[in-house]
Structure formats: C-alpha cells, structure tokens
C-alpha cells in the first residue's frame, strides 16, 4: 500500500519550517533565549538558526527534515554557510523520522567542527588535518 501522505514542494517547505521552529524553540529554552529562526538570505545563506554561540563565537546550524539522508551534501552546505557567516563551526540538525521530541534529533558535524566547538579555535584548514 502506497503512503497517502506524499510530500509536494509546499508541504515539504511547511514541514521544514515547522522543524526549524520546534528546534529553535527548544534551543531557546534550554540553551539561550536569543536563538531563533534566521531570515532566509539567498546565495549568502548563513544557516537556518540565529543566535547560537560557543566560546563567544557564532555557530551555524543547517536543519534538514527529509526522509532521504545525504550527510556529505548537508555538511558541505553547512561549511559554506559557516564561511559566509564567519562562524566558529557549522552543524547539521537532522530529523529522526518517527521521533517527535526536538531533543532526540541528530546533530552531524565534521571532526574539525567538533574540535572547534570543544576548544573555541578552528583547526587549520589543511587537507587531512
């Protein structure tokens, strides 16, 4: 039996916006009340949430609510947005389908971003380091 709840472009955008709002609201309560959804800016996008900081520096978050996982593409997008914003690190927050609780969603990042979050210093941008 085919799933009757197939997404179209409009319903996918609405689901993405809902996911962004749920994550932003949860982070605002549990981390910093300045965290909120970011206004979309086009080619120089700086992530989906604003107000995330670590060690006094900006961190960008790219949020994904899609059944098909593509972590490589998502991480490249987060890195581009991190550079656009001059942020310390970039992370991807991905929806775990069937799991509603915002705190139970998944965060993906490179080891370089993980090190930056832990130390407050972005590692040298050399291949393999």
Regions found by a protein language model. Give the residues of each.
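Catalytic phosphate/metal-binding cores of nucleic-acid and nucleotide-processing enzymes, i.e., regions
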Residues: 1-129
């Amino acid at each position: 039996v085919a799933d009757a709840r197939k997404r179209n472009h409009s319903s996918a955008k609405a689901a993405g916006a809902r996911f962004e709002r749920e994550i932003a609201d949860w982070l605002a309560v549990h981390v910093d009340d300045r965290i909120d959804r970011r206004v979309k800016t086009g080619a120089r996008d700086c992530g989906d949430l604003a107000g995330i900081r670590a060690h006094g520096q900006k961190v960008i978050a790219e949020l994904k609510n899609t059944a098909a996982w593509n972590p490589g593409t998502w991480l490249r997008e987060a890195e581009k947005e991190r550079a656009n914003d001059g942020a310390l690190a970039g992370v991807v927050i991905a929806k775990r389908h069937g799991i509603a609780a915002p705190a139970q969603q998944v965060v993906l990042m490179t080891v370089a971003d993980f090190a930056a979050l832990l130390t407050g210093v972005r590692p040298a941008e050399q291949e393999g380091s």
